[in-house]
Regions:
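Active-site nucleophile-adjacent alpha helix/oxyanion-hole segment immediately C-terminal to the catalytic cysteine
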Residues: 1-44
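Active-site nucleophilic cysteine motif
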Residues: 1-4, 53-60, 66, 70-88
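Residues in intrinsically disordered, low-complexity segments of regulatory proteins
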Residues: 3-5, 37, 77, 110, ...
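Intrinsically disordered, low-complexity segments enriched in small/polar residues
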Residues: 8-10, 63, 160
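N-terminal leader/propeptide and maturation segments of large enzyme subunits in energy/redox metabolism
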Residues: 42, 48, 70-71
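Active-site-adjacent substructure of cysteine-protease-like catalytic cores
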Residues: 86, 90-153
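Conserved catalytic-core surface of thiol
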Residues: 155-162
């Protein structure tokens, strides 16, 4: 989002929702009423960054969380991929043609071809992986090499990206 500085701002109102694990906690509704200030969102933010920079980045991260109906917790936050996809289209003005693909339904060469096509078109890929026991992680693939090695942004403040 920061690389493309998109969207200029969210649209509509995200309805309030209740956390699944804590029925006493309700995430309030949010109306998108101001543009994102992309010039105040550097690629990297740390504890020494100015407060206004931290606030802008925090706003974007929170907005991405609520449009995905994220389940916020003390140790982790999670969301269903389907909710994230729906929220990106409905509230962040992403193309309605944006869709989900399942790797299990394709042969590997076809899968790599599809990933490269998206990346060549300058469309980073929101990717999810999970274990049979239900654990998982959502991350971004934003580049590749000719040998089908992909660059992954794991979403851990730059830790272990590559």
């Amino acid at each position: 989002m920061q690389y493309y500085q998109w969207p200029d701002q969210g649209v509509g109102t995200v309805p309030a929702y209740t956390l699944q694990a804590d029925k006493n906690t309700q995430i309030p509704s949010k109306t998108f009423d101001r543009p994102y200030v992309w010039s105040k969102m550097p690629v990297k933010v740390d504890k020494n960054s100015d407060t206004d920079i931290k606030d802008e980045v925090a706003t974007l991260i929170y907005d991405c969380g609520i449009i995905s109906k994220s389940q916020f917790g003390r140790k982790s936050t999670w969301a269903y991929y389907e909710n994230a996809l729906e929220g990106m289209i409905k509230y962040m003005k992403y193309n309605k043609g944006t869709h989900m693909q399942n790797r299990a339904t394709r042969v590997m060469s076809e899968w790599h071809q599809m990933l490269r096509k998206e990346l060549d078109a300058k469309r980073p890929i929101l990717y999810t992986a999970s274990t049979k026991s239900g654990g998982g992680h959502m991350f971004v693939i934003d580049g590749y090499t000719q040998k089908n090695y992909y660059h992954v942004n794991w979403g851990w403040s730059g830790s272990s990206n590559g």
